[in-house]
């Protein structure tokens, strides 16, 4: 996974307009709105435990399906009881980004509360070329992965504001060198949008659009 050095002004306008709406919506009225999370997916974990080397080793030994088995996030499309206005606004944003990028579908749009996480997983249930756009208000979030060749655990700290990472997630039947174990978390509110693109040429064209 590599971090893109820049994002196009046109793309940032789309993302910033959404973030402005989101911040106003969660801070409307008395106190900050607490978005719902799927309590069952937490499974007793914390940010520290779900992103630890010990947890990675345990997941790699079991019959992992590819998806995160533990998480503390709000998935705007799939978490129960997400307010309709947030679900609809997420869908609008994803549609606008799909049109901008020329992609066919997005894989995920999630909000991390303070202390939120997605535990170690491989995404080998949905292999392909990936684009991840994340927002951090203060750089206190991170993306962590295991280098499939060196076996080194590498942590990519968030930058302040929007950032974009791109890479490839291999399928379960592909070479182990293409398996991409990763996790993420944040000590402050964070959002991530993920896109999966099946064809390398299309993915490379989308990266050009993103970088402007």
Regions found by a protein language model. Give the residues of each.
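Nucleic-acid-interacting cores, centered on viral/eukaryotic replication and modification enzymes
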Residues: 1, 119-120, 135, 189-195
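N-terminal auxiliary "cap/dimerization" subdomain that precedes the catalytic jelly-roll/cupin core
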Residues: 1-73, 78-80, 187, 200-212
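Residues at the C-termini of beta-strands that transition into short coil/loop
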Residues: 7, 113, 196
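Residues that cap or initiate secondary-structure elements
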Residues: 11, 90, 126, 139, ...
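Serine/proline-rich low-complexity intrinsically disordered segments, especially terminal tails, linkers
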Residues: 51-54, 82, 138, 165
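Extracellular-facing segments of soluble proteins and assemblies that are Gly/Ser/Thr-biased and enriched
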Residues: 67-131
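Catalytic core of non-heme Fe(II) oxygenases with the double-stranded beta-helix
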Residues: 102-175
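Catalytic core of Fe(II)/2-oxoglutarate
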Residues: 144-212
């Amino acid at each position: 996974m590599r971090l893109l050095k820049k994002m196009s002004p046109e793309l940032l306008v789309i993302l910033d307009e959404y973030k402005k709406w989101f911040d106003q919506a969660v801070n409307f009225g008395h106190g900050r709105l607490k978005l719902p999370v799927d309590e069952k997916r937490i499974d007793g974990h914390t940010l520290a435990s779900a992103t630890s080397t010990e947890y990675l080793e345990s997941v790699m030994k079991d019959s992992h399906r590819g998806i995160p088995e533990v998480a503390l996030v709000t998935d705007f499309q799939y978490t129960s009881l997400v307010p309709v206005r947030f679900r609809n606004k997420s869908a609008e944003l994803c549609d606008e980004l799909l049109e901008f990028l020329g992609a066919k579908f997005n894989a995920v749009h999630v909000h991390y509360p303070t202390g939120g996480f997605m535990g170690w997983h491989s995404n080998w249930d949905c292999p392909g070329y990936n684009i991840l756009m994340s927002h951090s208000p203060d750089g206190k979030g991170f993306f962590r992965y295991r280098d499939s060749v060196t076996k080194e655990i590498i942590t990519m700290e968030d930058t302040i504001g929007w950032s974009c990472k791109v890479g490839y997630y291999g399928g379960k039947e592909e070479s182990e060198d293409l398996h991409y174990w990763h996790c993420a978390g944040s000590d402050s509110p964070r959002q991530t949008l993920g896109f999966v693109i099946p064809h390398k040429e299309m993915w490379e064209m989308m990266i050009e659009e993103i970088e402007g």
